């Protein structure tokens, strides 16, 4: 059985003594060959698409696939959240190796390791799957605003392989809202959006085109509110 050893830390377990979660992930992926990846909001953050920090709590780190259970018990500077890869029919579609930014961490810089992480096209779908319990419409909307360079062919492939109708409908709710140039090149004919209305959030309003309940301010033509991060 694979495992890790860590030198006992100081009595108080200060933040400085905690393991950089990226080092733990790269060790599990590269040295121990565990088949999992970093995804969702975490992958979007690694790729520069998240510009806010969680206040008052450790940052959630989203892992997808067969991540080792001991990873969740390590005293890292993140809070691991384990997810399956069932959101897609093809489990490894839209996953690429990403060089870690050194930002002062000599180990990351010298070892030249990479992290297996979702591409932005996959990561935004994983992030949408966290609504409404583990993320907010405001945060997703802010992230979507910056997704100006998604690859339409990859978007099409991932949406066609996505197994959750509500995630696909939500994607188009935000995509239509922001009208990035790549959207007109997405082949909607191969994407199954299901049929019928979907009740997604309590007290929401039904989107007139995508037939899913969402906060009223995200309905086209409605005044915008701010539900906070």
Regions found by a protein language model. Name each.
Residues 1, 56, 204-206:
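Short, ordered beta-strand-loop transition motifs
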Residues 13-15, 32, 68-74, 220-221:
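Short, surface-exposed beta-strand/loop "edge" segments at domain boundaries and coil↔beta transitions
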């Amino acid at each position: 059985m694979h495992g890790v050893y860590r030198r006992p830390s100081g009595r108080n377990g200060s933040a400085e003594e905690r393991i950089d979660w990226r080092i733990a992930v790269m060790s599990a992926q590269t040295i121990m060959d565990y088949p999992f990846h970093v995804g969702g909001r975490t992958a979007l953050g690694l790729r520069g698409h998240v510009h806010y920090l969680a206040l008052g709590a450790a940052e959630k780190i989203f892992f997808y696939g067969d991540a080792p259970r001991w990873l969740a018990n390590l005293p890292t500077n993140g809070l691991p959240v384990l997810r399956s890869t069932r959101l897609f029919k093809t489990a490894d579609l839209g996953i690429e190796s990403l060089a870690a930014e050194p930002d002062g961490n000599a180990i990351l810089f010298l070892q030249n390791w990479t992290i297996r992480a979702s591409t932005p096209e996959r990561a935004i779908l994983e992030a949408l799957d966290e609504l409404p319990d583990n993320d907010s419409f405001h945060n997703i909307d802010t992230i979507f605003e910056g997704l100006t360079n998604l690859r339409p062919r990859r978007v099409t492939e991932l949406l066609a392989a996505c197994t959750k109708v509500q995630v696909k409908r939500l994607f188009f709710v935000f995509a239509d809202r922001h009208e990035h140039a790549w959207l007109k090149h997405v082949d909607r004919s191969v994407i199954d959006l299901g049929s019928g209305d979907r009740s997604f959030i309590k007290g929401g309003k039904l989107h007139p085109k995508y037939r899913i309940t969402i906060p009223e301010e995200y309905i086209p033509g409605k005044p915008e509110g701010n539900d906070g991060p």
